[in-house]
């Protein structure tokens, strides 16, 4: 797995931390990976083509 560095507003990090504390995710990294997977799924049409990127 590749490491990616990004900047996220403090308020969003606080919200992610709250989800981790409530047990929805085991850690922040998994919460963010889940959000990325959800975004990819949301933007992939039924043929598998990504609507947001040229493939």
Swiss-Prot record:
Principal location listed in the UniProt entry: cytoplasm
KW Ligase (keyword) present: no
Effect of inactivating the gene: Deletion of the gene does not affect the growth rate but causes drastic increase in cell size together with morphology defects. Division is strongly impaired. However, a small subset of mutants are still able to divide. The deletion mutant is insensitive to the cell cycle inhibitor aphidicolin.
Record flagged with keyword Manganese: no
A GO-annotated cellular component: cytoplasm
Subcellular localization, as worded in the UniProt entry: Cytoplasm
A Pfam family matched in the record: RHH_1
TM helices/strands, residue ranges: none
GO biological process, one term: cell division
GO molecular function, one term: DNA binding
Induction remarks: Part of the cdrS-ftsZ2 operon. Transcriptionally regulated by CdrL.
InterPro entries membership: Arc_rbn_hlx_hlx, CopG, Ribbon_hlx_hlx
Keywords for this protein: Activator, Cell cycle, Cell division, Cytoplasm, DNA-binding, Transcription, Transcription regulation
Purpose: Transcriptional regulator which plays a central role in the regulation of cell division. Activates the expression of the gene encoding the cell division protein FtsZ2, and of other genes encoding proteins predicted to function in critical aspects of cell division. Required for normal cell division but not for cell elongation. May act during the transition from stasis to growth. The CdrSL-FtsZ2 transcriptional network might coordinate cell division timing with cell growth.
Family statement drawn from the similarity comment of this UniProt entry: Belongs to the CdrS family.
Protein's recorded name: Transcriptional regulator CdrS
The species this protein was found in: Halobacterium salinarum (strain ATCC 700922 / JCM 11081 / NRC-1) (Halobacterium halobium)
